Amino acid sequence: MSLATLDATQHPNLPASAATLFKAKAQNKLSFEQIAQHIGRNEVATAALFYGQAKASPEDIQKLSELLNISPQVLEEQLSGFPDRGRSVEMPPKEPLIYRLYEIVQNYGYAYKAVLNEKFGDGIMSAISFSTKVEKETDADGNNWAVITLRGKWLPFSRF
């Protein structure tokens, strides 16, 4: 199994915790799925912790400390603040997979908006009251398909 690692030169805006966590992840040869199972989170949410895009709870810090053999004091210092979300990716993205996700929004963003507005009315889908997951499907011909589910609470615009 290949594991996701961090090349800090490609991610100059990540917090110090990213280097700490990714180094321990590599040393322990753990996947995000394995780490997620240990800390009781979704694997995308777990990866978001590593990239500094999600807030770690005290329980997350304790469990990560135990699993990754990192001092709880170091993790507490590096993970206890509020995330500075959205700074980790330059726009438009250059990394091909991230660019494809961006391209999906470019190509289908207004189509998603139109369909969502027809179904729910004037509003937005929350990225705060939100969950996501990634699944792998294999079709009858043996082709692998990525299935990304986005689930966000619908927030209607207020009239004032």
Curated annotation (Swiss-Prot):
Pfam family, one: Cyanate_lyase
GO biological process: cyanate metabolic process
EC number: 4.2.1.104
UniProt keyword list: Lyase
Name of the featured protein: Cyanate hydratase
Keyword field contains Coiled coil: no
Catalytic reaction equation(s): cyanate + hydrogencarbonate + 3 H(+) = NH4(+) + 2 CO2
Originating species: Neosartorya fischeri (strain ATCC 1020 / DSM 3700 / CBS 544.65 / FGSC A1164 / JCM 1740 / NRRL 181 / WB 181) (Aspergillus fischerianus)
Function: Catalyzes the reaction of cyanate with bicarbonate to produce ammonia and carbon dioxide.
Gene3D superfamilies: Cyanate lyase, C-terminal domain, lambda repressor-like DNA-binding domains
Molecular function terms, GO-annotated: cyanate hydratase activity; DNA binding
Domain of life: Eukaryota
Class of the enzyme per the UniProt entry, highest EC level: lyase
InterPro entries: Cro/C1-type_HTH (IPR001387), Cyanase (IPR008076), Cyanate_lyase_C (IPR003712), Cyanate_lyase_C_sf (IPR036581), Lambda_DNA-bd_dom_sf (IPR010982)
Residues forming the catalytic site: 100, 103, 126
Family designation: Belongs to the cyanase family.
